Amino acid sequence: MEDSGVNPMDSPSKGSDFGVYGIIGGGIVALLVPVLLSVVLNGTKKGKKRGVPIKVGGEEGYTMRHARAPELVDVPWEGAATMPALFEQSCKKYSKDRLLGTREFIDKEFITASDGRKFEKLHLGEYKWQSYGEVFERVCNFASGLVNVGHNVDDRVAIFSDTRAEWFIAFQGCFRQSITVVTIYASLGEEALIYSLNETRVSTLICDSKQLKKLSAIQSSLKTVKNIIYIEEDGVDVASSDVNSMGDITVSSISEVEKLGQKNAVQPILPSKNGVAVIMFTSGSTGLPKGVMITHGNLVATAAGVMKVVPKLDKNDTYIAYLPLAHVFELEAEIVVFTSGSAIGYGSAMTLTDTSNKVKKGTKGDVSALKPTIMTAVPAILDRVREGVLKKVEEKGGMAKTLFDFAYKRRLAAVDGSWFGAWGLEKMLWDALVFKKIRAVLGGHIRFMLVGGAPLSPDSQRFINICMGSPIGQGYGLTETCAGATFSEWDDPAVGRVGPPLPCGYVKLVSWEEGGYRISDKPMPRGEIVVGGNSVTAGYFNNQEKTDEVYKVDEKGTRWFYTGDIGRFHPDGCLEVIDRKKDIVKLQHGEYVSLGKVEAALGSSNYVDNIMVHADPINSYCVALVVPSRGALEKWAEEAGVKHSEFAELCEKGEAVKEVQQSLTKAGKAAKLEKFELPAKIKLLSEPWTPESGLVTAALKIKREQIKSKFKDELSKLYA
């Protein structure tokens, strides 16, 4: 019999059945595999230990370390224990790669608003870059130039400038001569500025050229300043009268100092690990600022700890730098970036996006020009981003709003555990249809965001997660801990927490009996947050009494800082900050009000730009001062037919006060606040609270005592 070449098993009917069953089976497998993997991975994530208990010395408490750090880290790699050593090694390793970028200045103009106020608008071009090698050469030249202009290496240098490339260069240059740098916020008022410079006996002051006028007015009060080095700025003219009025102080430009150093090189004098690198003045909420002494070892150890938990950075990453470098959060972020070989593009909060206040209409904001992959933010900025996006969505209305709301709910379900969305199918769809345009607000390429400076609300965290498509690493730390305490990991989907301890330190909870927070509390231990390890700083400059009050060294030699914050540990070892000792007030009838907790809850109202809740022990209710969101309140007034000529007039109208208070009550109830925690009366304030006004810090946290002092009459009337 002739072979037909056909296998009886390959009959058309059976082949068709097998094909159908194969497709069905394949489909079932395709569905089941992600489901099963999702279940497994979700279980793994929920059960993953991010922090583990450890026995340490010192006061009794409940202590955690990072789960992947049995030993505390202190350096990112061998031989890099100080700032100049770390920077030089990075520059040699990445010599030809981009390091510092600054936008080209094209022109500026002033526009006049309807109320007569003038506003500066800038037209900025693309970024121009300097490589690691080029920046290192400038740093060495500046270091030599400092010595050549007569600065004694045993004296201190202060930097009083906005965040910019020259700030970074001057900072690194000082370290090559073992010079301690005093950092001062560019927004600091005259009294605090004079105090900071005289207290630390600064010899050389580095400033923006626009600060010369302020300095010329106070130069007679500066007891130890001998040299002023100003940073030239495009579009800012230096008045000869400002230079000539400095008396015996020598005034030079930074370019002159660099040229002098280039011609007359000086051998470096490198510091030790325990040498004081920085005296950083806190932007605290009470009294004159305190100078925190940060060592080279502190700066390097915190950077090493962060690098262990941040998704791998490399030369392909670009960081947008716009927060104040005088704040330890921004300073440490830039140290992490240059240690990783990434690029730093400088901007400002006033030119950050296409719609920022100082951006000329029709031109690009910093993030549009830079397209960063990494950025830092403080909660107040992210709250404004959220508010802006929601406002745009509301204005579009109709199908656009319906689509956004539906997409947001689907992505929210995915982040909270929907396997279908979590595996990227829905994510790709909604990103393409809805969220791509929203991401363009921050340049469209953000892959990781670091948030610190204050607690970020869970709603804002989820919103940024979904709309920007990037994980958020929320950190907790203080100037006194060199920004390093805890940091949430990129794969942790939880909100409202600040992660496990960084690998460079420990976090301990100590019972606070008076407040009712104990480490024996169930289901989670609670207490005052105490940070120990390599990131804990040396103490306060010229203030041993205060240093002894909050810094302790245990029998094993570990240094601890008592933060005054209250926290609790979750079962996976992550910290949640729940209170602050100073912010808890006992009302007349015995109820305790946590002011910070209430402010965080009420801040979710669409009408709130800023808020301070006030409680008086001799009264049975609390009150609030509210700076309303101008856009939101004016939109309501237009729709409600409430007429007004000025925003200040609108803030005085009873209808507006009632509308805002109802919104606050709704937000408070949604956050499950008790009735006594809700403000019984409020006052609307039309002027925003800014660092320049002295009512908020550079990280935009409220300065409670200053606000109470400025508005004491308004607060008294609320209790009348």
From Swiss-Prot:
<keyword id="KW-0460">Magnesium</keyword>
<protein>
    <recommendedName>
        <fullName>Long chain acyl-CoA synthetase 8</fullName>
        <ecNumber>6.2.1.3</ecNumber>
    </recommendedName>
</protein>
<dbReference type="InterPro" id="IPR042099">
    <property type="entry name" value="ANL_N_sf"/>
</dbReference>
<comment type="similarity">
    <text>Belongs to the ATP-dependent AMP-binding enzyme family.</text>
</comment>
<comment type="function">
    <text>Activation of long-chain fatty acids for both synthesis of cellular lipids, and degradation via beta-oxidation. Preferentially uses palmitate, palmitoleate, oleate and linoleate.</text>
</comment>
<dbReference type="GO" id="GO:0005739">
    <property type="term" value="C:mitochondrion"/>
</dbReference>
<feature type="binding site">
    <location>
        <begin position="279"/>
        <end position="290"/>
    </location>
    <ligand>
        <name>ATP</name>
    </ligand>
</feature>
<dbReference type="GO" id="GO:0006631">
    <property type="term" value="P:fatty acid metabolic process"/>
</dbReference>
<keyword id="KW-0007">Acetylation</keyword>
<keyword id="KW-0547">Nucleotide-binding</keyword>
<dbReference type="InterPro" id="IPR000873">
    <property type="entry name" value="AMP-dep_synth/lig_dom"/>
</dbReference>
<comment type="pathway">
    <text>Lipid metabolism; fatty acid metabolism.</text>
</comment>
<feature type="region of interest" description="Fatty acid-binding">
    <location>
        <begin position="554"/>
        <end position="582"/>
    </location>
</feature>
<feature type="modified residue" description="N-acetylmethionine">
    <location>
        <position position="1"/>
    </location>
</feature>
<keyword id="KW-0276">Fatty acid metabolism</keyword>
<keyword id="KW-0436">Ligase</keyword>
<dbReference type="GO" id="GO:0005783">
    <property type="term" value="C:endoplasmic reticulum"/>
</dbReference>
<keyword id="KW-0067">ATP-binding</keyword>
<dbReference type="InterPro" id="IPR020845">
    <property type="entry name" value="AMP-binding_CS"/>
</dbReference>
<dbReference type="Pfam" id="PF00501">
    <property type="entry name" value="AMP-binding"/>
</dbReference>
<dbReference type="GO" id="GO:0004467">
    <property type="term" value="F:long-chain fatty acid-CoA ligase activity"/>
</dbReference>
<dbReference type="GO" id="GO:0005794">
    <property type="term" value="C:Golgi apparatus"/>
</dbReference>
<keyword id="KW-0443">Lipid metabolism</keyword>
<dbReference type="GO" id="GO:0009941">
    <property type="term" value="C:chloroplast envelope"/>
</dbReference>
<dbReference type="GO" id="GO:0005524">
    <property type="term" value="F:ATP binding"/>
</dbReference>
